[in-house]
C-alpha cells in the first residue's frame, strides 16, 4: 500500500504538556479541558479540528464529483468526552453538523453527506469505535 502522506507529532507531559508537529506548524501547550486557560489546546480540540477539516474536504470532493457547484459546504464537528459505563476511562463521541447551500435537494444532499462519511479517512478510522451523529442542514 502506497503512503500518500505522513506526519509526526510529539507530546511531552501528556494532557498537561506540550505538543508539536515535525514541521512545527502545530506547536502548542496542552491542558485538560477543565483547566483551559485560553492559551492552550487539548486533544479533543485537535481531534475536532482535524476531523472537521478532513470531513469537509471529503464532502466538497463528493459534491464536485457529482457536479454540484456553489454548495459551499461547512462542517462543524463537536467532540464529546463522555463517561463510559463499560470502562473506567472516558470515551469519545462526535456530532458532525454539515451545512450546504440550497443548490440541491435535501435527499441528494443527505446521500452526498453519507458518501462523504464513507470516504473520509477519519470516519473510516473511527467507524464502529465511537458514536457519530451525522446532521445536515440545507440553507439559503
Swiss-Prot record:
**PANTHER family (alphabetical):** ORGANIC HYDROPEROXIDE RESISTANCE PROTEIN-LIKE
**Can you name the source organism?**
Staphylococcus haemolyticus (strain JCSC1435)
**InterPro entries membership:** KH_dom-like_a/b, OHR, OsmC/Ohr_fam, OsmC/Ohrsf
Gene Ontology process terms (BP)? response to oxidative stress
Q: What protein name is recorded for this chain? A: Organic hydroperoxide resistance protein-like
Q: Which family does it belong to?
A: Belongs to the OsmC/Ohr family.
NCBIfam families noted in UniProt: organ_hyd_perox
UniProt cross-references to Gene3D superfamilies, sorted A to Z: 2.20.25.10, 3.30.300.20
Amino acid at each position: 500500500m502506497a503512503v500518500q502522506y505522513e506526519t509526526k507529532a510529539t507530546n511531552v507531559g501528556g494532557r498537561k504538556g506540550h505538543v508539536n508537529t515535525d514541521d512545527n506548524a502545530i506547536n502548542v501547550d496542552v491542558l485538560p479541558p477543565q483547566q483551559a486557560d485560553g492559551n492552550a489546546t487539548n486533544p479533543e480540540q485537535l481531534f475536532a479540528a482535524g476531523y472537521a477539516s478532513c470531513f469537509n474536504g471529503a464532502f466538497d470532493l463528493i459534491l464536485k464529483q457529482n457536479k454540484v457547484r456553489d454548495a459551499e459546504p461547512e462542517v462543524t464537528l463537536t467532540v464529546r468526552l463522555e463517561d463510559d459505563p463499560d470502562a473506567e476511562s472516558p470515551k469519545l463521541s462526535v456530532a458532525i453538523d454539515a451545512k450546504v447551500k440550497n443548490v440541491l435537494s435535501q435527499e441528494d444532499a443527505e446521500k452526498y453527506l453519507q458518501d462523504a462519511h464513507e470516504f473520509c479517512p477519519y470516519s473510516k478510522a473511527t467507524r464502529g469505535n465511537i458514536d457519530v451523529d451525522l446532521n445536515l442542514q440545507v440553507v439559503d
